[in-house]
Amino acid sequence: MAAFGLPNFGQLTEAFKKAQQIQQDAQKLQEELDAMELEGKNQDGRVSICLSGNQLPLRIEIDPSILLEGKEKAEIAILEALKDAHELSTSTMKERMQELTGGLNLNLPGIDDGD
């Protein structure tokens, strides 16, 4: 047992190694999220928006037929697709971060909270 309730040197070394591994894994995860293309669509599938795993917009595709239905209809369809893509991207990021931190109870806002 270590003096004064402090962890022994071996425990401290192990904790630092673990922290370094998490940092390396976090960097790798960041790169994986950047490379992802997650597609969201509106209800009828005529508008699709792709975001990266870090919510960066990558591209948008609009079926020309929706433009013939008027500005308001097109705006609604684009917003639906954007919301779908954003939800997919954020949930993917959250899942991957939880895998990375696996049971460490870091209480990271937006990641470890109970939704």
From Swiss-Prot:
Keywords noted in UniProt: Cytoplasm, DNA-binding
Gene Ontology MF terms in the entry: DNA binding
InterPro entries (alphabetical): YbaB-like_sf, YbaB/EbfC
Keyword DNA-binding part of the UniProt annotation: yes
SUPFAM superfamilies in alphabetical order: YbaB-like
Domain of life according to the entry: Bacteria
A Pfam family it matches: YbaB_DNA_bd
GO cellular component: bacterial nucleoid; cytosol
Location in or out of the cell: Cytoplasm, Nucleoid
Main location per the UniProt record: cytoplasm
Subunit details: Homodimer.
Role played: Binds to DNA and alters its conformation. May be involved in regulation of gene expression, nucleoid organization and DNA protection.
Family: Belongs to the YbaB/EbfC family.
Protein name, as recorded: Nucleoid-associated protein P9211_00201
Lineage: Bacteria, Bacillati, Cyanobacteriota, Cyanophyceae, Synechococcales
